[in-house]
Amino acid sequence: MAHEHGHEHGHHKMELPDYRQWKIEGTPLETIQKKLAAKGLRDPWGRNEAWRYMGGFAKSVSFSDVFFKGFKWGFAAFVVAVGAEYYLESLNKDKKHH
C-alpha cells in the first residue's frame, strides 16, 4: 500500500547535532580529564556530558528558583479569585437568607 498525499507518518532521517560543538574546555569536566590524565587514564565519553555546562543548562537551579517559579502568576490568579469572590458576595448581600 503506497503512502499518498503527504502521509509519511514521520518516517524520515533524524537530524543529530554535531558532536564537535560540545567542548569540555572551561568546564568542570576539564578538571576531571586532567586528573585522569595524571593517572594515565582518559574518559572518552566526557564530551557527552559537556551539554550540561552550556547554554540554559549552565545555570544551577536554586531553591528559590524552584519555590517561586510560578509565584507571580499564582499570586495574580489569587488576587483575581478573591476580587471575584468579594464582588459576587456584594451582589448577594442584599438578599437575606433565612
Swiss-Prot record:
Main location: mitochondrion
Task of the protein: Accessory subunit of the mitochondrial membrane respiratory chain NADH dehydrogenase (Complex I), that is believed not to be involved in catalysis. Complex I functions in the transfer of electrons from NADH to the respiratory chain. The immediate electron acceptor for the enzyme is believed to be ubiquinone.
Record note on modification: Methylation at His residues by METTL9 enhances complex I-mediated mitochondrial respiration.
Oligomeric form and interacting partners: Complex I is composed of 45 different subunits.
Domain of life the protein comes from: Eukaryota
One GO CC term on file: mitochondrial inner membrane
Entry's Gene Ontology molecular function annotations: NADH dehydrogenase (ubiquinone) activity
Originating species: Homo sapiens (Human)
Entry-linked InterPro entries: NDUFB3 (IPR012576)
N6-acetyllysine: residues carrying this PTM: K23, K34
Membrane-spanning ranges: 66-88
Lineage per the UniProt record: Eukaryota, Metazoa, Chordata, Craniata, Vertebrata
UniProt protein name: NADH dehydrogenase [ubiquinone] 1 beta subcomplex subunit 3
UniProt-annotated location(s): Mitochondrion inner membrane
Modified residues (N-acetylalanine): A2
Modified sites of kind N6-succinyllysine: K23, K34
Keywords from the UniProt entry: Acetylation, Disease variant, Electron transport, Membrane, Methylation, Mitochondrion, Mitochondrion inner membrane, Primary mitochondrial disease, Respiratory chain, Transmembrane, Transmembrane helix, Transport
Annotated positions of the Pros-methylhistidine modification: H5, H7, H9
Family membership: Belongs to the complex I NDUFB3 subunit family.
GO biological process per UniProt: aerobic respiration; mitochondrial electron transport, NADH to ubiquinone; mitochondrial respiratory chain complex I assembly; proton motive force-driven mitochondrial ATP synthesis
Membrane topology value: Single-pass membrane protein
Disease connection: Mitochondrial complex I deficiency, nuclear type 25: A form of mitochondrial complex I deficiency, the most common biochemical signature of mitochondrial disorders, a group of highly heterogeneous conditions characterized by defective oxidative phosphorylation, which collectively affects 1 in 5-10000 live births. Clinical disorders have variable severity, ranging from lethal neonatal disease to adult-onset neurodegenerative disorders.
